[in-house]
Amino acid sequence: MKLIIASNNAHKITEIEALLASISIDLPVVSLQEIGDVPEIVEDGTTFEENAVKKVETIAKVAPNDYILADDSGMSVDALNGEPGVYSARYAGDHDDQANIDKVLQKLAKVPNEQRTAHFNSVIALHSPKGSNLIVNGQVDGYITESERGQDGFGYDPIFFVPSMNKTFAEMSASEKNTISHRGLALQELGKKLPVWLKGE
């Protein structure tokens, strides 16, 4: 029995593995690439939760005896009526971080700083071999900067500013980001709920 991370995103897998290490999941962790032939996951849900559940249940069809963890996450900008939301990864087309950043900055070009509020959300679904799902979520609030700042991270990290840290995600170390990020908060919540959930399994 193992824990499969239902993602091909190397950055996301590295981040999740680091966070899983902190909550002591006693299972070997593998990525989708390591389990071979998997069906295509169509992320056509209208919410992060729908997409996360769709990922774990799709992979469960080919790995019914394993635990499967999937995250669906994205950034919602208030001045853009919640965009990019569930379309965060493909906001400007096919998974192009720079194009996505450029599109957000362009759309916010005339929006004053105080109205550039945004939120990063992560919903994590953990699917058990018995077919039940544990759902947790995390949210971090911030602002969209007027230009990119920082060299680390991925996705929208260079333009997502967190006031409590006085930095963008891309200006933070991995450990700083993992402590306060949406995915980090969701995994911390998973760590709290997991022991009780596993007893019920």
Curated annotation (Swiss-Prot):
Biological processes, Gene Ontology terms: nucleotide metabolic process; purine nucleoside triphosphate catabolic process
Entry EC no(s): 3.6.1.66
Assembly description: Homodimer.
Gene3D superfamilies, sorted: 3.90.950.10
Entries under HAMAP family matching the protein: Non_canon_purine_NTPase
UniProt-recorded Gene Ontology molecular function terms: dITP diphosphatase activity; ITP diphosphatase activity; metal ion binding; nucleotide binding; ribonucleoside triphosphate phosphatase activity; XTP diphosphatase activity
Residue numbers binding substrate: 7-12, 73, 154-157, 177, 182-183
Active site residues per record: 72
Names of required cofactors: Mg(2+)
SUPFAM superfamilies: ITPase-like (SSF52972)
Protein name as annotated: dITP/XTP pyrophosphatase
Enzyme class: hydrolase
Reactions catalysed: XTP + H2O = XMP + diphosphate + H(+); dITP + H2O = dIMP + diphosphate + H(+); ITP + H2O = IMP + diphosphate + H(+)
Annotated binding of Mg(2+), by residue: 72
InterPro entries named among the record's database cross-references: dITP/XTP_pyrophosphatase, ITPase-like_fam, RdgB/HAM1
Family that this chain belongs to: Belongs to the HAM1 NTPase family.
Protein species of origin: Leuconostoc mesenteroides subsp. mesenteroides (strain ATCC 8293 / DSM 20343 / BCRC 11652 / CCM 1803 / JCM 6124 / NCDO 523 / NBRC 100496 / NCIMB 8023 / NCTC 12954 / NRRL B-1118 / 37Y)
A cellular-component GO term for this protein: cytosol
Pfam family, one: Ham1p_like
Binding note for cofactor: Binds 1 Mg(2+) ion per subunit.
UniProt keyword terms in alphabetical order: Hydrolase, Magnesium, Metal-binding, Nucleotide metabolism, Nucleotide-binding
Described function: Pyrophosphatase that catalyzes the hydrolysis of nucleoside triphosphates to their monophosphate derivatives, with a high preference for the non-canonical purine nucleotides XTP (xanthosine triphosphate), dITP (deoxyinosine triphosphate) and ITP. Seems to function as a house-cleaning enzyme that removes non-canonical purine nucleotides from the nucleotide pool, thus preventing their incorporation into DNA/RNA and avoiding chromosomal lesions.
CDD domains in UniProt: HAM1
